[in-house]
Amino acid sequence: MTKGTSSFGKRHNKTHTLCRRCGRSSYHIQKSTCAQCGYPAAKLRSYNWSVKAKRRKTTGTGRMQHLKVVRRRFRNGFREGTQAKPKKAVASK
């Protein structure tokens, strides 16, 4: 019996299933850890040796629902509770 290519065809059990956090099929059932995001660890799995992977998952690749609003408010100096001045009527000749 070889332990290489011919043996791999006999495998039929799933080692990985869907991860609750990242949604990928990378959650190792026996280890109870995700190979992609590191779940159940509190912090996301991320390494400097994989710069491309960081680029795919970093801030700005998703909706940024909250950060978009904060950025706009920052440009206006975080002003709150003010009313827009009424537009002046254009003098017609």
UniProtKB/Swiss-Prot annotation:
Keywords: Metal-binding, Ribonucleoprotein, Ribosomal protein, RNA-binding, rRNA-binding, Zinc, Zinc-finger. Its cofactor is Zn(2+). It holds the Pfam family Ribosomal_L37e. The keyword Zinc applies. Zn(2+) binds at C19, C22, C34, C37. One of its GO terms (biological process) is cytoplasmic translation. InterPro entries: Ribosomal_eL37, Ribosomal_eL37/eL43, Ribosomal_eL37_CS, Ribosomal_zn-bd. GO terms for molecular function: RNA binding; rRNA binding; structural constituent of ribosome; zinc ion binding. Gene3D superfamilies: 2.20.25.30. NCBIfam families: PRK04179.1. HAMAP family: Ribosomal_eL37 (MF_00547). Binds to the 23S rRNA. PANTHER family: 60S RIBOSOMAL PROTEIN L37, RIBOSOMAL PROTEIN L37. Belongs to the eukaryotic ribosomal protein eL37 family. This is Large ribosomal subunit protein eL37A. It comes from Drosophila melanogaster.
